[in-house]
């Protein structure tokens, strides 16, 4: 006996609801978002170039510059630059003779600080709020054959950079220049005379290469053999002119006279 079952397919049970359809719209950058991202990327690149690239380039290029242009050795311990305040700082800068067996020192600087101003952009001149040189030391030597080490350095520079008649001085404005606790070692090996001058302090205010801009200066130095030098006045770089007074106190004239002979 056969049994036939008839039924409605829809009566098997309730059907599962259909999944809702989601449509994803492409993300669109708003204008302020594009500006924010672009500004952030530009600031990041500028910061990286200032905080890292500038010090790296200076430390890398200074020895190469000294070797190529001056035929001397140079070193620098540390360089820091803030791209937002435009302040450059460096420590332990040294220049030495390259040909001598003991690499005789020429010039060393304990610390250097340079403060550039943003108004250089609109002023069309390099505007420096401050240049400060701390603990510089110069070693001036006349060899037994009569060669002056500083003159040799200048002669090397002039050979690599012959004078050109065209062009003038760069547009430069320095609000304050200071040299602190300087020292000069003087040694004349030909005459058998040696002396040193320390401390040397020098300040220069409002000096400029712009036309008819006058600045003031002050210099003081003490000699180990006796004597105090004071020099102050005003100066201009364009045109080159100056006036002031020079005072020498407690100088050791017998020792100096013997050397000058």
Tell me what each language-model feature is.
Residues 1-7, 22, 26, 91-206, ...:
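Secondary-structure transition motifs
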Residues 9-15, 21:
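Intrinsic, low-complexity polybasic segments
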Residues 25-42:
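N-terminal Sec-pathway targeting helices
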Residues 43-145, 209, 226-241, 251, ...:
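Terminal hydrophobic membrane-targeting helix
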Residues 66, 186, 219-222:
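Short acidic-hydrophobic surface loop/beta-edge motif
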Residues 102-104, 191-224, 231-239, 247-249, ...:
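Beta-propeller and related beta-repeat scaffolds in trafficking/envelope systems
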Residues 244:
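Active-site-adjacent "gating/activation" loops or surface patches in catalytic cores
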